[in-house]
Structures are given as structure tokens and as C-alpha cells.
Amino acid sequence: MSQPSDIVKVIVALPTLSKKPQQGKKKKSKELEEITLQFRKDSKLQNVLDFLSIAPATKYFTNYNLKNSTGDLLLSSEEKTLRELCSDKDEYKVALELKPYNQYQALKHVLTSRDFFGFASETEDGLSNVAVSTGSKFYKLPLKEIKEKSPENEDKDTENKKPTSMNVTDEEKVEFNHMVHGLFETLKKEKKVLLKDLMNTDTSVVTPCLRSINFSPYNPVPAFYRTKGHLFYLQIVTLEGESLQVTAIPSGFYINKSTTSKFDPSPKENDGHVDTVHYTLYDLLASSSKNFVTHISSLEKKFDDLESVTYVRPACTTLNKPWLIPAIPTNGPDYLRTQIDSFNFEPERNFNDEFQSIKEIPTNTLQARIESERIFAKLTHEFTINATKGAMDILYGNGTAMNPDSPLEEQIFLKNNIFYSFVGDLNQTYADKGGDEAAIASANQDLRTLNMLTRLNLPNIHHLLTTIVDFGGKRILAQTPVPGLLSPMGVKITTNEETKEETVSELSSDICVKYGLDENEKKVVFNEEFDEILNDQFAKSFHLKKHTIQGTELVFSSQSKGIVGSDKRHYILDLANTYPLDVEFAKENFDDVKEASKKYPHRQTLIRPELVEKWWATKIENDKVELVKAYEENLYSYNPDAYQVPGVEDETVVEISKYLNEEIIPNVVQDYLNGNIISPYNGEHLADTFHKNGVNMRYLGKFANLVKEELRKQEEAHEAKLAQVIVDNKEYEEWEKSYLQKIETMIKERQAKINKLVQEGKEVPKELTEDLKLDDNEIKKPSTEKPVVVSYDELVPLIKTAELEIISRSLKHILRKYSRSLPPIVIPALISFVFNLLFGTTYNPAPAVESVDPLYPVDQYEFKNLTHDTLLKEIEQEAVVRYRYELEGDWFAEHELYPFTLIRSICNKFGVQLLNKDYFFSTEQLEEYKQSLDKKSRAKYVAPLTTFSVSDLTVIPKIKAIDYSSPISEELWSQGASIINENQKDGLTLLAQSIGFKEEVNSILHSSVAEKYLTLSTIYNKLGLNAEAIAFCRKSCAIYERVCGVDSFELLRALTNLATLEFANESPYNVALIYQRIIQTVSGYGLDKIHHPIFTNIFNYLEQLSLGVQDAKLAVEVLKSLGDFLVSIDGTESLPYAYIKSKLGNLLAADNRFSDALNQIKVAERIFTKELGTNHGSTAQARQWVDGLTNLIKDVNQKKQLQQDQTAASGLKQQPQKSKSGHNKKETTNPDLADKSVDELLSFIEGEDGKSSKTTKKSKSKGKNKK
């Protein structure tokens, strides 16, 4: 925490004419006259201004100056620190002085106020005009408040409570029981119902407090009124329905006399008085509409009750664009959206100049670095938004090409200083590497290099802002141009002396390639200055080896370029080949494949950056080289042109490629098997794991085959074990028979000796009356051998998820192929037709292509000839060519049963949003739906011709852009994590600062912030700070839901962590509630059908919770449900099923339900005998259970019969009695017995009933002897 001297108290005096909004009954004078704030002295004045822009007392003031105590204006002081301004004093007084509006400032005020009035929905972001975002659901989960535990209470609780019990109230127990039963009901619901409910997000949290606020049709201001100070006119409709015509003037706003049919901008009279001029729109509307004030207060209260992450708009990212969107996307009338462009005062932006200038800002202080990073993150995001909008205009045919006479795919565009081009092999650069496919791959690889450069922020090296936009099969590359490269240099006019004809030609640009590949000259060029710059940190950071190409020395790839722009900065371009070629893959799947149709689509198969860094780190660790030394000496570097340029080789590149194939990919499989990585929830989750480990998605097939091979080996080992168990069981039975015969013989012999001695009148020796002395070496003790099991929970989800990803990615490429030549309006017809062919042939066996527009007849397009069978054939071919994977048998059958899992994957990859409505995959589903309608609606209902229609979907862009992450935040996080064990306080402080800086740079609504909160929650939990851990994890969930989606793996992972934390904090209701949400998602996508371990994990936790709240009957229900689930996926003969039956037997026996317990244990014993063997410990224990319970039940029945016989014999009429465990008294179950040993349980049961019969004891003794 900061020292007092580092804090300054900033007192802001407010203007006296302020009519700031008052909430409730507050004190008047002082609070309205000034506000007091506290800041660190190193904070800038801009931080004060930022706070004033959101503070309730000042947020409606948008046009003012600050004056210091001497009356001097603080103009251009935003970047000064408060320490400089206050002369290091502890108090600093400033006054807020309002300024007269000009048109620009008045417009700014209207737009700012409009956001505060509820017109800025939290579901809107920079791409809302090209894709739909939806609202939140997490904040609607009725989670109980986080339990706070003081150390004193915790120690007391630990002393008093039983080992398995939780400190919960009776009310909590009831709520938990109800929630678990609700979870059972969720499991029974249809998958399409679960998904429809899951994806049906709520309406916007932010709701408008006015009906509308627009510019009046009387704009622009007539010349006569300009000199009277009129700036513009507004038309506002209040919630009461009253239409207000408002005039904006330098001193504020007033209601004028205009109507919809008459223009009179003079002040309106109210009760004989001229209406007041109000400086803010809030004051004007508050005086005119009671509902406005009420709704503003209600909205602000709603904000106060919610976490800010629920409603804030994204600043440096975009919201998730889900594959299922509300059936009727709302789009209320708002003329201001179109009117605002006519008041655009912003000059045309030069993103490149802004971007390069930020790199050159001095960052000598921490605050300067943070400010630089914040601007950098904001700029890259704004570029992405602008580039995407520009690309979409071009794709929709609204752009003007620089070369309009060229074919569409060759056209280039320059709009708002952003250069656009279609990605393809236009110059035949990749002619021998796959053509357009290679060019498309290289664009991704170039962007990866740029992302790395952005993080490194190397001095003197400049690159271009870049965004890739994929839409409808076309890819557009948007970049900031190199300064001067596209600028016209003038023209040259030449005259033909013979014909006297003049020819006009453009002069060539002075800006040209100085280093690397000069495409115009078809050669590699060298520049010493460029070489020096690149040979330092650039080469070391990317581990590049200096090499010679065409007699020229180069640091980077011979395909890359170095250009000095007109701004004299050194730019590097075309950096795709910076990373090495995956030479092993390229040779095997491209070079050595003779048949063109079986070649991998391209040879641009590079290694990912993560793999290079992992390999490099492994090398220095194995060779025990210091990190600094390895970096400075550029050890373990590679030649980026190796195997790319004929004749250029490098063994290091081969080594990296083998490292990927022979070590990393098998290790990823093993990590899944060992539980080091959780089973993937979906394809995106698997892809994330691949990428973090540096594995390319082209290895999906190899990965799936490795997992299949592991599954085959385990199944073979299991079958071999079962066969061996049969042999061992037979041997054991023979041994047991012979051993018992031996004992019987020994007993007979001893008895004969005793009889002889007795007959002779001799004393019987002690050794003849003691227990038989048996040789322990002859006894076969129960085995504790580890069971041979098949890891279905780990292996099957991996295979099925990999296959799903292969199928959906193959379909993405097929859709790209057919949509590439289509106009945007026809693409939905292609999507709906393909979906109908795949999933709708049961409903309509012969779906037709839907017509979309008379001017675009669908008959002229190639995709119309597709059929269900040919489409499946194409998918199979793509799977083989792109992923080297054979889809076997009737592979599509399971996707027809659960279509939405595959549909979701296709939509997310190609860019499709479907309406969240009822889709009919069979006529039976249609009839079921019709029967659910009332009679009147049923009569009017018109059944759809096909499952999917053009009207059901929209196509959206898929965007890849530079993802900026705060270096300062990462540095602090690394420092904090490294010292957390030695110095907890300082470590946590550094981690908190790291997240604080990350929020300041990227804003709180960012996936990287969510990831940090999730990790922080784990750290706090390990330190025993459960309440804080839960709070952090909840915040992570809220962010992930908005940024990644309600059904994203990131959110599922965070929810799973949250449930574990709530479990540790003894909040069973919260745990069950979270699990219900998880079950809704994973069951809706059919993960229960692919053996995903999340289900068994949830049931196991619920059983522990049930016992923890002393509800053994609920624990029995949970175990029965788990048993039913295991039967549905594995049948009734699996080992896990036997363990569940054994657990059930324990619980039922503890509940005195002996017959039921015996039935469960018999099943367990039978499976244990088959799977583990007769002489395994678990089998022996189960057999002991069976013997003990059988004798116990027999003993109880005998005594009961004896009592009845005695009663009948005595002739007495039997009187009704209250049984100790009768129905008149509620039975209580002791859950503490659930995990006791067999001996302990039997002792408890016998002792409780007072039935320690000799029969039972003999039975137990006999059982022990047999063992």
C-alpha cells in the first residue's frame, strides 16, 4: 500500500449553476459545491478528468476547463502528474469552469448524454453492424453470497464438525436437495430444448430512458439564426410520449416552440414564463419528464447492483458473436445512427502514422509505459474495427477500386488510409507450393509474426497494422500502407515522333525495396543499415541465422522485404516465412506424393511460434546453457530459407520438425491420459491446447490416430486381462478347494488325537486346543494389483472431438470453395442448402436450393448439383487430404442424431448465425410441435418446406487481427508468481498490480483479463483465501461469457473451477447451481454420449456434498443416477459401475436397508470377480459383504420367526408395537458410515440391532479363514 505522502487529495469545486442529479435525500450545499477525490501523486491530470467523466456529480458536464487555486486554467496539462501540479503537497484544489458550447462540443455532449440515457446497449460493439451480439446470463444465476470465514470461526468449526460434514443450515440443506433434483430433471430434457434455453440470452441490461433523441428535420440551422448562436436542433420524445423540440445554443439547451409542421426555434413559454436554458440535457429533461428521472435512477440503481463487467461496453475487444441468436433480433428506430455522419468533425485518420508515433513515445517512467500501452491497445482495436468495416463494404460491392478494370480478385482498394487486397497467388509466388491455398496460409503466418513483433516492440523496426477478414469464401487483407509507397509520383508524357501520339505513364515511386526480395527486379537486395538493425534484437528474438541467398547476406527470409518509407522509418513486410518449414510434414505429404489429388493442399506448412520457443527452451535446458548467454550469442538459430529455396538446407530445421512429430504430439496425448490437461469440451478447446503446445491443426488426423492406437492397446490389454482372470479364478478355486480339504484333514487328525487322549484319560496338550497353525506361505492373500482398465473417459472424448473438428473444418473448406464466386446475397442459400442436405433429408428427402433474388438465379451456380451422398464424399476426401484421416463406416450417423454439435462447429468456423428457433429434423418433430400449439394457432400454422431456410441465418465475417497484450502486466505477473511462496504479501500485491495495469490497457472486458482473474482465483485458493478466490473466479466467468460466449470452453472451464471453489467454501447450493448450468451446456452438445468425464466428476462431487450435508438418501439418489449414466454409455459390466454398486451397498446398509444393500453388493462382487479376479482385495471384500449381509438378514428373519412362533404358542394376541426403525418414526441415516470398512460397517450394524449372533461371528470367522 502507498505511503500517505504518495497520496494527494483533489478537491473539485463545482459550478454554482449545476443542477446535478440528486439520488434520494442527501445533504445539499457542500456535496453540490465540491467533491473530494484521492489519487496517487504520480497519476496524471487526465486520470482526474477520466473520473469526472463518470462521477454522478459531473458526468453530464462535457465541456469545461479546470482552474487551479490561483485562477490559472489548466490547459494542455492533461499529461502532467499531480505531483508537478500540486508542488508535492497533500491537497490540490481545482475549480470546474463551464465553457460555452460550439457545434462540435454540443454534439459531443448530446452523444455522451445519450449513452448515459440508456441508448448505449451493452450488446453493442464496433462490429454490431456486421454481426449480432447477445446479452449475459451469468449475472442471472441466483448464486448465494460468498461465505466469509474468520480464522477464529474456522478453527472452532474444525474442532466441532465431523470429518465429512459441512457447516450448513437446514435451509441450505433443503435448497441443495431441491437444486440437485432440478439437475436430474435437466439431464432428462431433450438436447435441442437445453440448447434453445442456454442460447436464449436475456434482453439488454441497459434500457433507454427516452423513446428517442434525434436531430430535428429543421437542421441545418438557417442562416438567419446562426448569428443568434443556434448550433442545431433536437427532437426528443419522452417516455410519456411528449415530443420536445430543443434548440442548442452556446449556453446550453432550451425547449423551443417548433412543432412537426411549424418551425419556430424561439424559447417556449411555460405558465407564462420563458423556458429556462439548461446547460445539460439531463437538467432540461429532468425538468420536463418525471418518468425520465425515475428511469435514470432505476438504471443507475441497476448498475450499482451489478458487476460492471455485466454492462460495460468493450473498449479493446469485441463481444462474442454466437452461432444461435434471438429469434427476432431487436433493432429499434434510432435516426441518430444515420444522422451523426453529417456532423463528422473528425479528420481522416492515418493509422500508420499514429501507430508508428506511439512506438516512438518516450517510456522512461512506469506511468508513461502504461499510457503508451493503453493507446497502443486502443489503436490496434480501432484499426481492426475500421478495417473490418471497410472490407465488408468492399465485399458487398460498395468500394471503389484503384484498378477497376482488373478482375475482382486482383483489385486493390485504398480507403481511409487503409490498403485492401484480396488474398491469392496473384503474382504466382506460390505457384509450386499450392497457389491460392499457400497464399491464404501465408497470410495467417504473417499475422503470427506481426503479433510477436507487437509484443517485442523492438526499436527501429517498424511493421504494418494488419487485419484479415474472411467472409463468404473470400479473404481480404487490410493493412496500413508504407508511407509513400502508394503516393502518386506524377506522370511522364512521351510523344511518338512518327505518329505524334502522346503516351501518359506514371513515374515509378522512389519508395522501393532496400533489403530482401525485390519482386520488380526479381532478385534479393542488400542494405547495410537494414542488416544492422535486423541482425541485433530481431534475429535473436526469432532465433534466425544469418545466411546467403543469391550471393546476398540476409537475416530474415528471402521472401520478406525491407522498405524505407517516406517518413524515413524502416519497415519490414511479408514476414510469413520467418518461422521454419515443417520439413518432415512437407516431404511426406507434399513433396513425396506423386498423385496431385492426394497431396496436401499446399507446401506452406510452417512451424508455429509456440513450438519454436518450446524447442529453444528445451535446448538450453538440456544443454544447461544460461538463458542470457543463449539469447545474446543467438545460439540454436535456424535458417528460415532452409528447404524453401532449392539447395538450402539446415539440420536445425529438421530437428525442430522432428521435435514436433516425435516428442510434442505424443506428449500431448500422454498429458491428456495423465490428467495434466482436462478433456476438451469442444473443438475450440482442443485447438487451444494444440496451439499452446505449438501443434498445427493439420495434425488432427495424426493425433486422432495416436489416440485410437492407445485405445486399441488398452482394449487388447483389457481383453488379455479378462482371459487371464478366468484362468486365475479357476486356479484359485482349485487351490481353495484343496486348501480347505487340507484344513479339514488337519482338523480330523487333531480331533482324532484329542479323542485318543481323552479315551486314555490323559490331559489334552494346549497346542491341540489352540487355533490351527497354518503356514502363511501357503495362503493366497488377496491381491492389490492395479486394475487393467480402458481409459474411455480420456480417450473417447479426444477421438470424437478430433473427428468433429476434422469434419467441421473440412466442411469449412468445402463451403469456401463453393461460396468464393458467389455474391453475398446468394451465400445464405448455399448454407441453408448444405445444412438441409446434411441434416434435413429425413424431414425432406430432396431439398431444393432456395431462390433469393430474381437477378441471381440459383441454377447458374455450381453448388446446386450437390447431393447428400456427394457432400459426404467431399467431406471424406477433404479429411484425407487436409488431415490425413480416414472417416470410417457410417461416420455421419451420430451427427444426424445430435446435429447441433456439428452445426455449431461449422457456424463458428465459417461465420454463420442461426435464429434460435425450433428446427424440425423429422416429420415426427414437426407433428410434436404442432400438437403443442393451441387449436387456433395450429390451424394457421404453415409447415416449413425444409429444415433450414435462407430466412433462418445470416453470414458474418471471421476476423484475425493483432492481439495486443500488456508487457508491463506480464512482467509484474511473472515477478509476483515467482515470489508468492516466499513473500505472500508482496507477491499478491504484484499480481494485483498486474491485473490492474492489464485492465487499464485492455479494459476489464477482455479475455486476457478473464484468464488472469481465473489464475488468480487458483492462487488465492491455494493460500486458503477462499472468499477472495470465489470473487475473482465469478468475475472471470462474467467476462468470459460476454467475450467468448455462453457455451464457450473458456466459460465451462471457469465454471468448473468456480464449482470447486464453492465446494471448498462449503456452499453446496451454489455448487449444484453451477453444475446445473454446466450440465445444460455439455449435455445439450451431446458430451454425455462421448464418454466425457465431466459427468462422472459432477456426480462424484454431488455425492460428497450430499454426505457433507448429512443427506445420505440424496447421496443414494445421486449414485443411482450415476449408475444409470454409466449403464447408458458402458453397459452393466464395467468396473466403474461395480464401484458405484459397492458404494450404494455401503450407503444402503448404513440405512438398515439390508436386502437392497445385498442386491447391490452381489452385482459388484460378480463384476469384480470377472474384472479383477476371485482373489482380488475388492472381490474378497465384496464377498465378505455378501456373506455378512446374508447371515445378518437370515439371523433377523430367524429371530422374527421365533418371536411370531412364541406369540402364537402362548395364545396371546399380538399388539402393535413401535419399531425402532418403524414408519412412525423418521429414519436417520449415518452418512459417516458410507466410507467405513466392511468390518466396521458390519460391527456397527450388528451392534445397533443388538444381534451379535454366533452365526454371524462364525460366518465372519469362516470368511477370514477362507482368505
From Swiss-Prot:
Key words of the record: Cytoplasm, Repeat, TPR repeat
UniProt keyword Cytoplasm, yes or no: yes
Annotated InterPro entries: CLU-central, CLU_dom, CLU_N, CLU_prot, GSKIP_dom_sf, TPR-like_helical_dom_sf
Disulfide bond residue pairs: none
Region (Disordered): 1203-1267
Function comment: mRNA-binding protein involved in proper cytoplasmic distribution of mitochondria.
GO molecular function: mRNA binding
Domain Clu: 329-586
Biased composition (Basic and acidic residues): 1224-1239
Organism: Candida glabrata (strain ATCC 2001 / BCRC 20586 / JCM 3761 / NBRC 0622 / NRRL Y-65 / CBS 138) (Yeast)
One annotated GO biological process: mitochondrion organization
Predominant location: cytoplasm
Protein name, as recorded: Clustered mitochondria protein homolog
Family according to the record: Belongs to the CLU family.
Composition bias type Polar residues, residue spans: 1203-1219
PROSITE patterns: CLU
Transmembrane feature ranges: none
Residue ranges with Basic residues bias: 1254-1267
Compartments in which it is found: Cytoplasm
Subunit architecture: May associate with the eukaryotic translation initiation factor 3 (eIF-3) complex.
Repeat positions for TPR: 64-102, 420-453, 716-749, 795-830, 904-939, 1010-1043, 1138-1171
A cellular component term, taken from the record's GO annotations: cytoplasm
